[in-house]
A protein has these predicted regions:
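Alpha-helical scaffold segments in soluble metabolic enzymes
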Residues: 15, 160, 207, 299-306
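A structured beta-alpha segment of the ubiquitous adenosine-cofactor-binding alpha/beta core
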Residues: 18, 112, 124, 171-236
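Active-site-adjacent "lid/gating" segments in soluble enzymes
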Residues: 63, 75, 135-142, 211, ...
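Redox-cofactor-proximal catalytic regions of oxidoreductases
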Residues: 65-89, 171-207, 265-273
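Alpha-helix N-cap/helix-initiation motif
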Residues: 128-129, 197, 288-292
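Acidic glycine-/aspartate-rich tracts in secreted/extracellular proteins
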Residues: 152-155, 220-221, 249
Length: 345
């Protein structure tokens, strides 16, 4: 409606929107699962209740002063690691306990002998759209076997986003198999369809879990648990399993049920406020979906670190990644600059 009938849409929505404050609209969106988020300024980001509830915001010292500083955008087995402005190379070692590394070195050597560093690794990908599926694809490009799990009646909706065009003409073929975006995000994967409301499907999924190294998902918090596939259930059949959950705002906190697309996540995190001109309203990043691939790269980093530790120790891990926190992570220079100067970047 906003694209085809923008004036009519504004006429319907604007009067209602102006009757509410920004905080009221955010509360209504969270209560009713609406895809809406406030556009936070940089000076508001560090005071966001969701970030403090999850322990994202810590402190660092510089030039004799203390500044609020965000940690990494994920918790590993319910542990948060804080990052330092000058830290390099050792960040994840503070979150993942050290090990002897002997088995790790042996397994890595064996994998390299197969040609790719992650050969022999199996990943179950319950993700949809972009952020989680792209983690699986990058792991597949490094040699992992990735199995995409979909619901037969409700497949990944990216399957229906556009058609292949060749020489100016739409290429004919099955609707679900002809999306260039789907193949870009999911190339190289095996696939299986499971109706997880059926007990036999859950049984089959658990059989795959028992033979896998990593499970990835980006559903709303609680979705996997309601299907009988929460981390505690999965760990019972595979103690070495790593699970990566990538919801919009993390698995807990006052905004945990945030429903979002990439632009609304960018607004929630304050990134949209950086796009514009001085003394004018923020333009925002419009429809540029930075939130998805940015979360994918953070998820990949966390998953590789946890998998490395699992190979060395035999202990799995649960990774609770927040996609909006991943956006805050790339804004650290602006957050520090705003505190030092007292001005909005």
């Amino acid at each position: 409606m906003g694209t085809r009938y923008p004036e009519e849409g504004d006429a319907l929505l604007a009067p209602w929107l102006t009757r509410h404050t920004r905080d009221e609209l955010e509360a209504l969106a969270l209560e009713h699962n609406l895809i809406l988020s406030p556009l936070r300024r940089i000076d508001e980001v560090l005071a966001t209740p969701q970030f403090h509830h999850r322990g994202l915001i810590g402190n660092t010292s510089m030039d004799g002063r203390s500044y609020a500083w965000p940690g990494l955008p994920f918790r590993v087995s319910d542990r948060r690691v804080q990052s330092e402005p000058n830290l390099s190379g050792t960040l994840l070692s503070r979150c993942l306990p050290a090990s002897s590394g002997a088995e790790h070195a042996h397994r890595i050597a064996a994998s390299k002998a197969d040609g790719l560093p992650l050969a022999g690794l199996r990943v179950l990908d319950f993700g949809w759209v972009w952020s989680a599926p792209w983690v699986g694809t990058m792991l597949g490009e490094m040699g992992a076997q990735v199995i995409k799990v979909e619901h037969g009646a409700r497949p990944d909706n990216v399957r229906l986003s556009g058609r292949i065009i060749r020489d100016g003409r739409v290429v004919e073929g099955p609707n679900r198999e002809m999306s260039p975006m789907f193949h870009q995000i999911n190339h190289g994967k095996l696939g299986i369809t499971l109706n997880l409301k059926h007990p036999r499907a859950v049984e089959l999924a658990m059989g795959l879990v028992a033979q896998s190294d990593l499970v990835i998902e980006n559903m709303s918090p609680g979705s996997m648990e309601r299907s009988g596939l929460g981390f505690e259930s999965l760990r019972a059949v595979n103690a070495r399993l790593v699970m990566l959950s990538m919801s919009a705002a993390g698995q807990f906190g006052p905004a945990a049920n945030l429903r979002a697309y990439a632009p609304t996540m960018s607004a929630f995190a304050g990134l949209e406020s950086l796009v514009g001109y001085s003394n004018e309203p923020a333009i925002g990043a419009l429809n540029f979906a930075l939130g998805d691939p940015n979360a994918s790269l953070h998820g990949l980093l966390a998953a590789l670190a946890a998998l490395s530790r699992a190979r060395a120790t035999g202990e799995g891990a649960y990774i609770d990644l927040s996609q909006v926190e991943s956006l805050v992570s790339v804004m650290r220079p602006h957050l520090l600059s705003a505190q030092r100067s007292g001005r909005q970047p």
